[in-house]
């Protein structure tokens, strides 16, 4: 499939960029703005119970019920996201992931109902994929309304693993792993030509030291999982990022 020309931002007139959050509001807005700098979308939505501050140019905020837990987030993504999406597809992002390279966009991404970074820790062929930076069709969003919610299983695992056979029986198509690796990376080593990424442990690769430190200092105290804090501490120590290392030590205390 033909990809966008180098240096050009693709016009994704059939894609809504959307973030759903109750935490890390400033970082989430930054992720939306970073994505908007690399691609043009039909609409850009921030769905949150908190009114945003700062630069919201081109972003529409819609108030939703508070998202206080991962279960709240999963329930919203499965049951209510479809109410806000008017385009055939939605690009779902979180605070720790965004579009890296608009030239890496491939129209073939739109041939599928779900595409996200492959998970390396599964070996059964159902490794696609991560929901934190994922492209989903409206058809998938509507189908998800009928899926049973099984806390504490996360919504992307419900969609892509637990109930994937049920969705495929309805004609839902999951992207092949080779295409998903070009779409995004998370826990698999990047090849350098991905459209986007997800993960706090990857965010630091794409920010200056001062920018990353500001983002992490602004996060709510319990935002990062303990393993993420250890991972970021090790990364910072190996690269001499003293400020970030001290921030992770503070969060581990």
Predicted features along the sequence, with ranges:
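Active-site-proximal specificity loops/subdomain of glycosyltransferases
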Residues: 47-88
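Conserved donor-nucleotide/metal-binding helix-loop-beta segment in metal-dependent transferases, i.e.
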Residues: 97-128
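Generic structural signal for small/hydrophobic residues in well-ordered secondary structure
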Residues: 44, 95-96, 137, 159
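Short beta-strand-to-loop acidic/aromatic patch adjacent to the donor-nucleotide binding site
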Residues: 87-98
